[in-house]
Amino acid sequence: MNNIMAAVLAASAAISVSCGPLSKIEPNPENALKAQQFLKEAGVYYLATVEGKQPRVRPFGTAEIFEGKLYIQTGKKKNVYRQLLKNPLVEVCAFKDGRWIRITGELVPDDRVEAKKDMLDKNKSLRSMYDENDDNTIVFYFRNATATIASFTSEPETFRF
């Protein structure tokens, strides 16, 4: 094994030991609401997924609270849906008023009609494209999420939900 490979393996082991596997974070509806409010005020946020080894980023606008969890919505016909099924680990970023939020976590699919209906009822513009009873609409909620709100002029605020 060459020196570069040994260094990479040592760094990976150190990260694994210090960070551990993805730990379970207790749901926190208050913190989920704080993240959702930032996303709503920003208007547009960017969702990053992975397709194979290629990162994929696209704009999103849906961010709602249902049963105390932060939900987003997409269509089952989209590439992002297939990417999330293969690898549910994501990062979201939004910017407003000189501050930004980054949210990392898992997106868990929720195909229940009541979850989809809640999302669509809160986002009337989606009704022309989606219906809670169609075969396309899907909502996801964040699990084991960590959010950081930061700026260049103040200390970052990190919270979990």
PLM feature spans:
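Extreme N-terminal tail/first-helix region
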Residues: 17-41
